């Protein structure tokens, strides 16, 4: 069994490995609240476009 066949062969149907950012594909720093599913870096970039307003 070659390395290419073994790498990422385990099914990721649940947990942190199964979710990724809708914009960048990153798996770290994911905001799932309200069904956003975007990374926090992408959220800072697209927050105004989505409709979030900064009050302070």
Swiss-Prot record:
Gene Ontology BP annotations: cytoplasmic translation
Superkingdom as given in the UniProt entry: Eukaryota
GO molecular function, one term: structural constituent of ribosome
UniProt KW keywords: Cytoplasm, Nucleus, Ribonucleoprotein, Ribosomal protein
UniProt keyword annotation of Cytoplasm present: yes
Keyword hit for DNA repair: no
Intracellular or extracellular location(s): Cytoplasm; Nucleus
Subunit-structure text: Component of the small ribosomal subunit (SSU). Mature yeast ribosomes consist of a small (40S) and a large (60S) subunit. The 40S small subunit contains 1 molecule of ribosomal RNA (18S rRNA) and at least 33 different proteins. The large 60S subunit contains 3 rRNA molecules (25S, 5.8S and 5S rRNA) and at least 46 different proteins.
Entry function: Component of the ribosome, a large ribonucleoprotein complex responsible for the synthesis of proteins in the cell. The small ribosomal subunit (SSU) binds messenger RNAs (mRNAs) and translates the encoded message by selecting cognate aminoacyl-transfer RNA (tRNA) molecules. The large subunit (LSU) contains the ribosomal catalytic site termed the peptidyl transferase center (PTC), which catalyzes the formation of peptide bonds, thereby polymerizing the amino acids delivered by tRNAs into a polypeptide chain.
Descriptive protein name: Small ribosomal subunit protein uS14
Organism: Schizosaccharomyces pombe (strain 972 / ATCC 24843)
Gene (UniProt): rps29
């Amino acid at each position: 069994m070659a390395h290419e066949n073994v790498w990422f062969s385990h099914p990721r149907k649940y947990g942190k490995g199964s979710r990724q950012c809708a914009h960048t594909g990153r798996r770290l720093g994911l905001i799932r609240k309200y069904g956003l599913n975007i990374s926090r870096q992408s959220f800072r970039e697209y927050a105004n476009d989505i409709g979030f307003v900064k009050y302070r």
